[in-house]
Amino acid sequence: MNHFLDIHKTDTAELRQMMDSAHAMKAARKGRPKGQFDEDQPLAGRMVALIFEKPSTRTRVSFDVGVRQMGGQTMVLSGKEMQLGHGETIADTARVLSRYVDLIMIRTFEEATLLEMAEHATVPVINGLTNRTHPCQIMADVMTYEEHRGPIAGRKVVWAGDGNNVCASFLHAAGQFGFDFTFTGPPTLDPEAEFVGYAREKGRRVSIERDPAKAVAGADLVVTDTWVSMHDPQSARERRHNQLRPYQVNEALMAQAKPDALFMHCLPAHRDDEATSAVMDGPHSVIFDEAENRLHAQKAIMRWCLGL
């Protein structure tokens, strides 16, 4: 039984195994209707719980479709239904769910909730997102880079904006997949030192550059994310926009990167805030391939978790 809690907690060879599996499964589905089962149906007879304390579109749809394509069934549970940690303990919830399902995916706010779920579950647990990390997204991003440009090892990845949970998982991936990483954003939104330190300990070049044009110079991949959350009050939104406006990914900034550089955004996006529509719909952008690859990467993760 394998939990998938964070990229840095998984062996590099096993990450490579998952990545190769994701590429193979995507290729095998070429031309097939979306609702058609995979030929081998590895999840036939299996039940997967999808827990959403924090709501999502891409995570819910991609996991649900992925389980069904592999022949399994899903049970989707919202935060209101679960009341995690309010009443029944997370530990007891994990033990009970383990009697009903074969695999648990949880998208939650606090990392502690994920870790407690994994500690007490007797079935594999997948991190669908926490406020600290988002490993499933980064597996999809690495997959997307590989299918467009080949190995990501030795490449320069630049993150522009807020050093959030997706940025943190990129730093974990830098250490595991062997690419260099530059962050450009305001000092108040730097990624946590723990994540920067991990990548550096793995021998990767990690830099923080306040000038976005200098940061993006020679980049192979430029990545950004939303500046605000749907839950942020208006005052916080205005403050963050003022902080982050200099780090918008626009055509002028992308012109500083390599001519064949890619642009990624995990979506949903606030168009013409963190990135302009000209970039999102332009020749560097692979954002919709990136979104699709959530499906294939997560299918590979589920197979690995179950030893299939």
UniProtKB/Swiss-Prot annotation:
Disulfide bonds: none annotated. GO terms for molecular function: amino acid binding; ornithine carbamoyltransferase activity. Pathway: Amino-acid degradation; L-arginine degradation via ADI pathway; carbamoyl phosphate from L-arginine: step 2/2. Carbamoyl phosphate binds at S56, T57, R58, T59, Q83, R107, H134, P135, C136, Q137, C266, L267, R294. Keywords: Arginine metabolism, Cytoplasm, Transferase. It comes from the Bacteria. SUPFAM superfamilies: Aspartate/ornithine carbamoyltransferase. L-ornithine binds at N165, D225, S229, M230. InterPro entries: Asp/Orn_carbamoyltranf_P-bd (IPR006132), Asp/Orn_carbamoylTrfase (IPR006130), Asp/Orn_carbamoylTrfase_sf (IPR036901), Asp_carbamoyltransf_Asp/Orn-bd (IPR006131), Orn/put_carbamltrans (IPR002292), OTCase_ArgI (IPR024904). It catalyses: carbamoyl phosphate + L-ornithine = L-citrulline + phosphate + H(+). Its EC number is 2.1.3.3. NCBIfam families: orni_carb_tr, PRK00779.1. Reversibly catalyzes the transfer of the carbamoyl group from carbamoyl phosphate (CP) to the N(epsilon) atom of ornithine (ORN) to produce L-citrulline. Belongs to the aspartate/ornithine carbamoyltransferase superfamily. OTCase family. This is Ornithine carbamoyltransferase. It comes from Cereibacter sphaeroides (strain KD131 / KCTC 12085) (Rhodobacter sphaeroides).
